[in-house]
């Protein structure tokens, strides 16, 4: 595996693969890799000739009072995991490599990015869309892989690619979970043992939402209220966002009527925000399928 730090070096390294018509699979990450990231890597390796992973903690997507400074970083550890996973290239730029001068160009996707998690984190998804579009321009991948745990992000990236005619296939990969159901996340490392035990309320709330919906609760306000009450049973958990939405458009639904719905949760446990979601209903939604730009 070759570790690359600069944009020009990466472009030079990928040039032979492009000339030979090889397909490039790309997995953008912020590092401190876990099982979910490695599943994205596995899919990319299976479906492409060349696999590239980026590790970049993007300051544009962190708010003033968020965890940019303490976000977990361990490049040596991550490089070892990616080497074992048989990744071809690791792109690990610095902030000065990616943003040599203050950015004046921003990619934003309102209103998709201003609701749900975006309501709690203003500007977050503009930062995500900006860095992902820049990485796509640098890498020029044939396919890019994103976890469905960050479902709103996946919808936004798909829409950005469609709107901007970026020639990359966006692949959503099912959420990978710990043995007790908690979604794998780099931020789980923040949790104390007590908080980690409490965090199981998040996937349990999704189970409860599924049960209630299947039992006939099809009023979105009632379902949101029931989920909030369920989470509030755990004193260490504070539900910040509970959203029932259309899984393709993220639009609010006046009535559910048995259709597939997205249940998105943004829950604070201690100082840690945990994100999780599930699509529930009677049929698989289009968003979970691979779609070409």
From Swiss-Prot:
The active site is at residue 37. Keywords: ATP-binding, Cytoplasm, Ligase, Nucleotide-binding, Pantothenate biosynthesis. It is found in: Cytoplasm. The reaction proceeds by a bi uni uni bi ping pong mechanism. GO terms for cellular component: cytosol. Belongs to the pantothenate synthetase family. Its EC number is 6.3.2.1. The gene is panC. SUPFAM superfamilies: Nucleotidylyl transferase. One of its GO terms (molecular function) is pantoate-beta-alanine ligase activity. (R)-pantoate binds at residues 61, 153. Its main location: cytoplasm. The lineage of its organism: Bacteria, Pseudomonadati, Pseudomonadota, Alphaproteobacteria, Hyphomicrobiales. HAMAP family: PanC (MF_00158). It comes from the Bacteria. ATP binds at residues 30-37, 147-150, 176, 184-187. Homodimer. GO terms for biological process: pantothenate biosynthetic process. Catalyzes the condensation of pantoate with beta-alanine in an ATP-dependent reaction via a pantoyl-adenylate intermediate. Beta-alanine binds at residue 61. InterPro entries: Cyt_trans-like, Pantoate_ligase, Pantoate_ligase_C, Rossmann-like_a/b/a_fold. It catalyses: (R)-pantoate + beta-alanine + ATP = (R)-pantothenate + AMP + diphosphate + H(+). Pathway: Cofactor biosynthesis; (R)-pantothenate biosynthesis; (R)-pantothenate from (R)-pantoate and beta-alanine: step 1/1. This is Pantothenate synthetase.
